UniProtKB/Swiss-Prot annotation:
This is Photosystem II protein D1 1. PANTHER family: PHOTOSYSTEM II D2 PROTEIN, PHOTOSYSTEM II PROTEIN D1. The record marks Y161 as: Tyrosine radical intermediate. The chain crosses the membrane at residues 29-46, 118-133, 142-156, 197-218, 274-288. The D1/D2 heterodimer binds P680, chlorophylls that are the primary electron donor of PSII, and subsequent electron acceptors. It shares a non-heme iron and each subunit binds pheophytin, quinone, additional chlorophylls, carotenoids and lipids. D1 provides most of the ligands for the Mn4-Ca-O5 cluster of the oxygen-evolving complex (OEC). There is also a Cl(-1) ion associated with D1 and D2, which is required for oxygen evolution. The PSII complex binds additional chlorophylls, carotenoids and specific lipids.
């Protein structure tokens, strides 16, 4: 008998690290994208929490009137936010080392850029990590394609819109009330409710919710019972089983009779592709709408679009919306602008009919 002994090739530190990063046997898959994702998302999260709790007021409008957004400066969970960086900074990259002091960096809203940039890099890497794990497991790439919709939406409001408007002070504040303020101002300045891409986005989000509820309720209503009446039907499912867990024929027949025959899918794969594609395409259009409105390609404007035989305007709901837009625009940055651009751009009307006699 002959025994052959081979010396085990010793792996270097880098090789062991690479094997650990790309191993699909780990409880948590890291991946090469994860090597960048983990530190960036941790940095964004830590900075967001600290800024939300303790950041001093920020001169967002660049007019020396700071706005407080942290909890320690009088806000609560609803009104608190990480305030966008100052309009005086504009689109300049503003890391800590660009400021003369930490106080100046905080006053000009430096934490906002730190959070947003690290967050965007992190979610981009999360998307890449989804693709990477799918590739290593032999899956198709639809998971990361679906996730690209919220990533595109985040990039639109945090990056593309500020670039189009010329300042990161126009980005969405990182808070609940700040988000609503961003929405109101966006409507006032761009009439987003009358933009077709926003309409497609609304159809995608609400339609996706409706289809998800319909699908879940149909499946739950047509489960194949594998248990006794005393046990929950959920116990009849075994993870990895080959048999169908619900009767798609019964669900198809029910829904086809409830609406009409061709409103129901008889192919499970087509059905689930539709459930994924509908909201994803809708959110893609929303992100595209934000991106084009960033460069002032705004929603439709129906100002006084209906007139009578005498040429007088017949006001419609569109005119009511336009008036609401003007009101919101007046309230926005009230100390920086006395009137919205729609009014300030017209010729000035004289205050008095004639010159006042100063000599009395």
């Amino acid at each position: 008998m002959t025994a052959t002994l081979e010396r085990r090739s010793s792996q270097g530190l880098w090789d062991r690290f690479a094997d650990w990063v790309t191993s699909t046997n780990n409880r948590f898959y890291v991946g090469w994208f994860g090597v960048l994702m983990i530190p960036t998302l941790l940095s964004a999260t830590i900075c967001f929490v600290v800024a939300f709790v303790a950041a001093p007021p920020v001169d967002m409008d660049g007019i020396r009137e700071p706005i407080s957004g942290s909890l320690l400066y009088g806000n609560n969970i609803i009104t608190g936010a990480v305030i966008p960086s100052s309009n005086a900074i504009g689109l300049h990259f503003y890391p800590i080392w660009e400021a003369a002091s930490m106080d100046e960096w905080l006053y000009n809203g430096g934490p906002y850029q730190l959070v947003v940039f690290h967050f965007l890099i992190g979610v981009f890497c999360y998307l890449g990590r989804e693709w990477e794990l799918s590739y290593r497991l032999g899956l198709r790439p639809w998971i990361c394609i679906a996730y690209s919709a919220p990533v595109a939406a985040a990039a639109a409001v945090f990056l593309i819109y500020p670039i189009g408007q010329g300042s990161f002070s126009d980005g969405m504040p990182l808070g609940i009330s700040g988000t609503f303020n961003f929405m109101f101002v966006f409507q006032a300045e761009h009439n987003i409710l009358n933009h077709p891409f926003h309409m497609l986005g609304v159809a995608g989000v609400f339609g996706g919710s409706l289809f998800s509820a319909m699908h879940g309720s149909l499946v739950t209503s047509s489960l194949i019972r594998e248990t006794s009446m005393e046990e929950s039907q959920n116990y009849g499912y075994k993870f990895g089983q080959e048999e169908e867990t619900y009767n798609i024929i019964a669900a198809h027949g029910y829904f086809g009779r409830l609406i009409f025959q061709y409103a129901s899918f008889n192919n499970s794969r087509s059905l689930h592709f539709f459930l994924a594609a509908w909201p994803v395409i809708g959110i893609w259009f929303t992100a595209l709408g934000i991106s084009v409105m960033a460069f002032n390609l705004n929603g439709f404007n129906f100002n006084s679009s209906i007139v009578d035989s005498q040429g007088r305007a017949i006001y419609t709901w569109a005119d009511i919306v336009n008036r609401a837009n003007l009101g919101m625009e007046v309230m926005h940055e009230r100390n920086a602008h006395n009137f919205p651009l729609d009014l300030a751009g017209t010729e000035s009307a004289p205050v008095a009919v004639g010159n006042a006699d100063l000599n009395g």
